[in-house]
Amino acid sequence: MPLSYQHFRKLLLLDDEAGPLEEELPRLADEGLNHRVAEDLNLQLPNVSIPWTHKVGNFTGLYSSTLPIFNPNWQTPSFPDIHLHQDIINKCEQFVGPLTVNERRRLKLVMPARFYPTSTKYLPLEKGIKPYYPQDVVNHYFQTRHYLHTLWEAGILYKRETTRSASFCGSPYSWEQELQHGAESFNQQSTRIFSRAPVGPCIQSKHQQSRLGLQPQQGQLAKGQRGRSGSVRSRAHSATRRSVGVEPSGSGHNNNSASESASCLHQSAVRQEAYSHFSTSERHSSSGHALELHDISPSSARSQSKGSVFSCWWLQFRNSIPCSGHCLSHLVNLLEDWGPCTEHGKHHIRIPRTPARVTGGVFLVDKNPHNTAESRLVVDFSQFSRGSTRVPWPKFAVPNLQSLTNLLSSNLSWLSLDVSAAFYHLPLHPAAMPHLLVGSSGLSRYVARLSSNSRIHDHQHGTMQNLHNYCTRNLFVSLMLLYKTFGRKLHLYSHPIVLGFRKIPMGVGLSPFLLAQFTSAICSVVRRAFPHCLAFSYMDDVVLGAKSVQHLESLYTAVTNFLLSLGIHLNPTKTKRWGYSLNFMGYVIGSWGTLPQEHIVQKIKHCFRKIPVNRPIDWKVCQRIVGLLGFAAPFTQCGYPALMPLYACIQAKQAFTFSPIYKAFLSKQYATLYPVARQRAGLCQVFADATPTGWGLVIGQQRMRGTFVAPLPIHTAELLAACFARSRSGANIIGTDNSVVLSRKYTSFPWLLGCAANWILRGTSFVYVPSALNPADDPSRGRLGLSRPLCRLPFQPTTGRTSLYAVSPSVPSHLPDRVHFASPLHVAWRPP
């Protein structure tokens, strides 16, 4: 007789009219019964030939290619001038007194952050901006390039000037070593050579400083020597390699001594200009990733300079005859002054050797599902998470649901702060720059790569006939529209650029770890400064709690001022006041406990409406369904064990078929959600123990025992004993000597037993008692005669071993010789 839904609920002891627990519960551990129920519910069917369902409501497989939508009107978000103060430790100590070891260690981690992968793969510049939107290639190129420029202007990126130097905007840190020229710092005045050199001798004067000291110049053009900034095989007269905005200075010859002075800077800057107009082949040479310029003899260059100036690709159109109605020369002739070919930051620093390559691609997407007007930059540094260049990221503990409830479930009044661009607060050491490079190859090479026109790939980038190969109707129309948005910046953005991260990027596994360490240390400082209040953070989500609303407002003012004094930028418009029910990490947390937020509850209802019955569903779609249901599982009667059939199918990579009964069972489970309550401290008065053949309980002074019909595995027997203890005594603190029961993970038990036990033991706290001290040990072995005294076992609710919440005691007067601690860095979070 097939199993009905009512019979199934009765079987799981979810209804009140069940028989005595000692008889009913052990039956659920029977393997035969579990198999029969699974067959009735269609849970273990072999693979069938019916085609799989690949979409359930909004859920598609994890690897489905949902095409992103390009928005030509995306606004690039503005970034404030974020500069986290370097003496952050001193400022915190002024605020709260001496820091604890933990706080100091965490703050030192991010001042500056360091990133040293074992090996790095370099990609050509053409892969800098991903062709993510094939229909809007040019538009996406300029939008992305503008976003990168905005980040550079906000001091979040370095711009690679030469192989060994970079420039940036904003305030410098002490570890960013400014380039020195003689005794004089490389300041704003000396950078003018890049944009427009002053009349008179070049910065490389009569004497050049080499590593050996001051040496006279070795003639007009020192050919054979190699500069440390990379090997360039055939060098040309600097006056002939004139790029727009770089006027040749009087004596400006390139003298290549082995120095890191301005000659290298000037020559490399001009070389970088040249590399967008000359035919360049990029090779990985033994001396570094250098650019090789081919077939440019001084004589050929000189003859060119007399005719058409060797200028940038963009400005060459000015002197050319229009090839058609949509020739780019029409656009270029709209403006007389297109501005400089490149821009340079206020500060120039020394960096490790950095090739003109990228290590990750970038593209734009909507800022979030609710804000499609603004764009967000996605940086793909996935090479550091895959294959041979994989980096083992540090793991850090995240509070599980019970810890979070123990900590935050209270009658406090709450508000949450929004840290604007939180990741971009944390500075990176310049030594990390060669590993975190983004950029673009310039418009001409980008369009050429995506164009099917093979003529563009020949080696004649400098000639006029080749120039007009780019003139297509689509490109012309796109650029004319973009001209309205970007104006003369079109010229700047059409040049190649290489940028390295100065603040931690979002696409690297190190960043979430560092952000969590940083915000947890700051919150720890705030908690110690205001011991009667609560400050807590998860990543960039910071919450403050206080006894009354007035108290909370004054706390908010004090904390905001403190954070601003450290250089942390808050977004006051996004500060949310929650009253007594805090919305945090997808939960609503109040004095009554924790529940999922309403939008998640609605998502679950929508999901159940869409789940088809008796049709195989692709296991990747099941992953999505389980992800959603798993989040709310702790709030249901049967918890995670109810989802075990789905987990099993995903593990076997097989399709899953929902039977009407299993679907009805699950939807009923999720129709009523029970809050997860805060654990309370107390004394343990109830103990349970079991052997494979029998169980024993001690409830206060009362002792009882029983036997199983057939021998059971020890973990199953211990779980049954704990269930009996809970149902007989009603106590919510139970002592047990079994670590599996203690962990409260019932997914490895027989399925029906796991579901029933989860409901019986919901809200129970367990205390570990060693077997030798367990008073229930004798009754479980059938000995009721000997009465062992009850051990005094206090239960203390835990807030978890998390790097996000450390109780901060007053600083000890002296440090112990050796501190033993299990580092929270190696503890991965698993669902509670």
From Swiss-Prot:
One example GO MF annotation: RNA-directed DNA polymerase activity
Task: Look up the EC number in the record and give it.
Answer: 2.7.7.7, 2.7.7.49, 3.1.26.4
Ranges of compositional bias, category Polar residues? 205-220, 251-263
Per the UniProt record, the site (Priming of reverse-transcription by covalently linking the first nucleotide of the (-)DNA) maps to Y63
**What Pfam families is this protein classified in?**
DNA_pol_viral_C (PF00336), DNA_pol_viral_N (PF00242), RVT_1 (PF00078)
Q: Where is this region: Spacer?
A: 178-335
Region (Polymerase/reverse transcriptase domain (RT)) residue ranges read: 336-679
**Stretches the record annotates as Terminal protein domain (TP):** 1-177
Q: Which UniProt keywords apply?
A: DNA replication, DNA-binding, DNA-directed DNA polymerase, Endonuclease, Host-virus interaction, Hydrolase, Inhibition of host innate immune response by virus, Inhibition of host RLR pathway by virus, Magnesium, Metal-binding, Multifunctional enzyme, Nuclease, Nucleotidyltransferase, RNA-directed DNA polymerase, Transferase, Viral immunoevasion
**GO annotations under biological process?**
DNA replication; symbiont-mediated suppression of host innate immune response
The record's catalysed reaction(s) read: DNA(n) + a 2'-deoxyribonucleoside 5'-triphosphate = DNA(n+1) + diphosphate; Endonucleolytic cleavage to 5'-phosphomonoester
The residues that hold Mg(2+) are D418, D540, D541
The record's InterPro entries line, in alphabetical order, gives:
DNA/RNA_pol_sf, DNApol_viral_C, DNApol_viral_N, HBV_DPOL, Rev_trsase/Diguanyl_cyclase, RT_dom, Viral_Replic_Matur_Polypro
Listed HAMAP family: HBV_DPOL
Give the similarity note: Belongs to the hepadnaviridae P protein family.
**Function recorded in the entry:** Multifunctional enzyme that converts the viral RNA genome into dsDNA in viral cytoplasmic capsids. This enzyme displays a DNA polymerase activity that can copy either DNA or RNA templates, and a ribonuclease H (RNase H) activity that cleaves the RNA strand of RNA-DNA heteroduplexes in a partially processive 3'- to 5'-endonucleasic mode. Neo-synthesized pregenomic RNA (pgRNA) are encapsidated together with the P protein, and reverse-transcribed inside the nucleocapsid.
Q: What is known of its domains?
A: Terminal protein domain (TP) is hepadnavirus-specific. Spacer domain is highly variable and separates the TP and RT domains. Polymerase/reverse-transcriptase domain (RT) and ribonuclease H domain (RH) are similar to retrovirus reverse transcriptase/RNase H.
Q: Which PANTHER family match?
A: POL PROTEIN, RIBONUCLEASE H
Q: What else is known?
A: Hepadnaviral virions contain probably just one P protein molecule per particle.
Q: Could you tell me what this protein is called?
A: Protein P
Organism whose genome encodes this protein: Gorilla hepatitis B virus (isolate Cameroon/gor97)
Q: Which gene encodes it?
A: P
